[in-house]
């Protein structure tokens, strides 16, 4: 009997907002999405804050969104867990963090704190850096240096000076700590194996080579003078009397305070891994601690907050029922539909096929807002002809990745591209008598300007996301409002399966 696939289509960064100004989703011509939204059962889902296990009012993000969708339950995020540990004091007893601190006390060496200097809460949080500085102060560490990666994506594009001033004020207040380097996240947090970028960040932190400035603020000013916003600040070494204030050396300790793994892996490998071939470098003999587990295979790295074991995810449960599934996305979101969707497990489930389409090699995605959506679509249509899959999880990266550029016209084009692909895929699935659930993991493209100052906005939003059910059998079916964790139970109901008890989400079908 021919398969009737149940598909989840995640339009990354496609939120819902009534505001028209700066709304690329509203401005785009999207006849297919509009047709489905207006003629099929639909609702809105919470994709930020408490709805996805983040602090109240915290914008959602792709990692968190896919974790919640795949788990079928609200997954309390690293941001929330670490913040709570600081508040209740457990943070200061953490074994891995104390190991790093004790190493510098024993060797009279230096403690380096590196990570994204941002209150954005997507990859890191400034308060966690303050917690580490507090720990170092409590333990009488004498030499502490910060290697600040600058954001400009999850916060306004030119806001770094505010966060630098905040952390410098804090360090002055406690009498400990100094910024040693600054690097835009474009260089220090690449995730696409562009080692030539990471090498510049590495050279600044380890070799003391790169752009030079007398202070972090002056480094940012120089970058703004060259029309480079925070994300693109060239790795810069802070110098005093012509010498770097600090570099990472043998016997030092490094704590990487980013909690989100995907953009933290490459620079970790460059500094800490024994077997590394991204670029030529000498391996350091250091104590390296990561805030969370970036990759289970990393050797010589200690983890402060280990992974939560999430069992019976949607993928695992469907696999155990003997059904076939496909995960498909382009490079930028491949980890999201695989690793994050599976609850932080790298290994595919039994009968889980994966299709990875390369993202285009462009400096920024406004230069190619179509990204690889057409190639993803072609591959998916080909796979659907195989009559193999019971469940398909698909991600279109465009509304998010192009939304991050802050360029409205490009984001509009991104949404239009995805809509065109959406039409082809839904037509195909309906011909197979399958069903499609259309949703997003968080908002982005629906707000491309900061309403407080009229400037471009590159960050995610706290807006709800759509949830649309398209099938040949939608009569009398209605959908309740809910959260991302309710998607998996809804899909299981559509597949005629009971949800496992671990899934605390509820089916959205009334």
Swiss-Prot record:
Belongs to the BPG-independent phosphoglycerate mutase family. Pathway: Carbohydrate degradation; glycolysis; pyruvate from D-glyceraldehyde 3-phosphate: step 3/5. The keyword Electron transport does not apply. Keywords: Glycolysis, Isomerase, Manganese, Metal-binding. The gene is gpmI. Pfam families: iPGM_N, Metalloenzyme. Its EC number is 5.4.2.12. The keyword Ribonucleoprotein does not apply. One of its GO terms (cellular component) is cytosol. This is 2,3-bisphosphoglycerate-independent phosphoglycerate mutase. Catalyzes the interconversion of 2-phosphoglycerate and 3-phosphoglycerate. It is an enzyme of class 5 (isomerase). It comes from the Bacteria. It comes from Clostridium acetobutylicum (strain ATCC 824 / DSM 792 / JCM 1419 / IAM 19013 / LMG 5710 / NBRC 13948 / NRRL B-527 / VKM B-1787 / 2291 / W).
């Amino acid at each position: 009997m021919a398969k009737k696939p149940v598909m989840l289509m995640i339009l990354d960064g496609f939120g819902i907002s009534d505001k028209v100004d700066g709304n690329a989703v509203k401005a785009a011509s999207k006849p297919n999405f509009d047709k489905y939204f207006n003629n099929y059962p639909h609702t809105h889902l919470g994709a930020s804050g408490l709805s996805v296990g983040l602090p109240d009012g915290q914008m959602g993000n792709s990692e968190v969104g896919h974790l919640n969708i795949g788990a079928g339950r609200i997954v309390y995020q690293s941001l929330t867990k670490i913040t709570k540990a600081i508040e209740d004091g457990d943070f200061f007893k953490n074994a891995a963090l104390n190991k790093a601190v004790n190493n510098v006390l024993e060797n009279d060496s230096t403690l380096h704190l590196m990570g994204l200097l941002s209150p954005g809460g997507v990859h890191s949080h400034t308060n966690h850096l303050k917690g580490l500085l507090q720990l170092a102060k409590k333990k009488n560490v004498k030499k502490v240096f910060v290697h600040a990666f600058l954001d400009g994506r999850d916060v306004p594009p030119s806001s770094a000076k505010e966060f630098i001033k905040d952390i410098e004020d804090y360090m002055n207040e406690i009498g400990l700590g100094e910024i040693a380097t600054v690097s835009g996240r474009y260089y220090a947090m690449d995730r696409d194996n562009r080692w030539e970028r990471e090498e510049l960040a590495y050279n600044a932190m380890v070799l003391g080579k790169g752009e030079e400035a007398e202070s972090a603020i002056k480094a940012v000013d120089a970058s703004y003078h060259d029309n480079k916003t925070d994300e693109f600040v060239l790795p810069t070494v802070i110098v005093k009397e012509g010498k770097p204030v600090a570099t990472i050396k043998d016997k030092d300790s490094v704590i990487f305070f980013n909690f989100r793994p995907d953009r933290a892996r490459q620079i970790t490998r460059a500094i800490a891994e024994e077997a590394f071939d991204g670029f030529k470098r000498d391996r350091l003999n250091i104590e390296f601690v990561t805030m969370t587990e970036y990759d289970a295979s990393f050797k010589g790295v200690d983890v402060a907050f280990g992974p939560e074991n999430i069992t019976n995810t949607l993928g695992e449960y469907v696999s155990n029922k003997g059904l076939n599934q496909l995960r498909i996305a382009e490079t930028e979101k491949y980890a999201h539909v695989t690793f994050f969707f599976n609850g932080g497990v790298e290994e595919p489930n039994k009968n889980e096929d994966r299709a990875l389409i390369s993202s285009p090699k462009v400096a920024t995605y406004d230069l190619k807002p179509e990204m690889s959506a057409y190639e993803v679509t072609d591959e998916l249509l080909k796979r659907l002809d195989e009559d193999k899959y019971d469940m398909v999880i698909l991600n279109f990266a465009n509304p998010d990745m192009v939304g991050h550029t802050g360029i409205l016209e490009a984001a509009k084009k991104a949404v239009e591209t995805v809509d065109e692909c959406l039409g082809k895929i839904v037509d195909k699935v309906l011909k197979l008598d399958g069903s499609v659930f259309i949703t997003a993991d968080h908002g982005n493209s629906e707000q491309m300007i900061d309403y407080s100052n009229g400037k471009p906005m590159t960050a995610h939003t706290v807006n709800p996301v759509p949830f649309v059910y398209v099938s040949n059998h939608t009569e009398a079916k209605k959908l309740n409002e809910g959260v991302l964790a309710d998607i998996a139970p809804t899909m299981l109901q559509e597949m005629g399966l009971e949800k496992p008890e671990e899934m605390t989400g509820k089916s959205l079908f009334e």
